[in-house]
Swiss-Prot record:
Protein name as annotated: Cytochrome c biogenesis ATP-binding export protein CcmA
GO biological process: cytochrome complex assembly
EC number: 7.6.2.5
Gene name, Swiss-Prot/TrEMBL: ccmA
Keywords annotated in UniProt: ATP-binding, Cell inner membrane, Cell membrane, Cytochrome c-type biogenesis, Membrane, Nucleotide-binding, Translocase, Transport
Amino acid sequence: MRLTGRGLRCVRGGRQVFAGLDVDAAAGEAVAVVGANGAGKTSLLRLIAGLLALAGGAIALEGGDSELTLAEQAHYLGHRDALKPSLSVAENLIFWQQFLGGEPADAQASLAAVGLGHIAHLPAAYLSAGQRRRLSLARLTAVRRPLWLLDEPTSALDAEGQAMFARLMTAHLESGGLLVAATHTPLGIAARELRIGGAA
């Protein structure tokens, strides 16, 4: 499996964010997208996820499921945690399993993998910032998808949380998955760097 983007151009609010950008990621590979604030790191992830329209170029996922769109084979995890405070930790994850569809994994196992199994009953309103991030990351294993698109995935995570997430990413890559992450900090795993130039 391989993700390819050729000659990508992004325009937002009438302003060209970037143009002529190429991106590649093969099965088992991580790509760290780096650059100044406003350079277009998040925009690139959103283009790949199909959340923004391409102003130029083409994106393809070769070797994926031909009956599914690229978006249906990808997890897009934004920098904000999309959680409902009134729902429990487990209920939030089950909501995402049902919303995303596909083949769900065991929700309790996914919560345990991110260190939240013991508070599955707790309303999300009571979670710390780091725990909220862990719950968001649990979506990645709760529904299996080969491509992970991650925007500042380690934000709010302490050292233990970062090590936990590095293990999740490593397991994903070792199983043939691929990931592209926009980040200002090291991911904690081997990753090829894609630098986007320019500033806001």
